[in-house]
Amino acid sequence: MLCCFFLAAKTSLSGNVFKKEMYRLTVYHYTTSAQETVLNNYLKNALLPALHRYGYKNIGVFKLIANDTTVLKTMYVYLPLKNLQDHLAITDKLVKDSSYQKAGAAYNNAVYTNAAYTRMEVILLKAFSLAPQMKLPKLIAAKNERVYELRSYESATEKIFANKVYMFNEGGEIDLFKRLNFNAVFYAEVIAGSHMPNLMYMTSFENKTDREAHWKNFVDSPEWKKLSTLPEYQNNVSHIDIMLLQPMEYSDF
């Protein structure tokens, strides 16, 4: 009887500790300041309050750090999910939510010639085995000084991609990021997106200078010098995208 109790407790505990989160990353591409105003009002006053009412938390809203002359601008909404069903259920809830519909009227009812964005994409991700839960960054800088770095690593084939995921997990890359205090928010593989096979992860810094110092420590570390030269990990990344982001003042983190 006692043995069964401990077995059940162990099963329950392992389920809580090792259950992988899902993430939804919504990317808005737009060109004008008017679109940005509508997007911000929608996210701040309609979408995030609705998601909070539904019990979702730790929602991140970020704007791509770019030159003022950049034509195509980008905004990201990061949402942790328990499972894929959450992704499907949210839309159904929003359709029936009168408070959301009223607060987001300018966005939801925009005419086809005056949409709040040029294009929108949704990326679904599954957390890595050695980073199954997102972590809120421990930063003290004001939000307008922080830098969140979102990276996407693409691989040539699914098999090669699996090798890069292994390198992050069992290979020790995540451990190195932890040791060097990169304040990672998440590490995950993309399960639905336009650049597969690929993984994405987000790290965070107090400011740009702090980011540069952390990456110098990373590339100079003996662990990375050894890991990056191991023959089994060569050519496992075919393309890298680096997005430097600033959190909006209404972002949860």
Task: Kindly give the residue locations of the regions a language model identified.
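Bacterial N-terminal signal peptides
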Residues: 1-8
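Short S/T/G/P-rich N-terminal loop/turn motif that feeds into the first structured element of a domain
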Residues: 12-101, 105-106, 110-224, 234-253
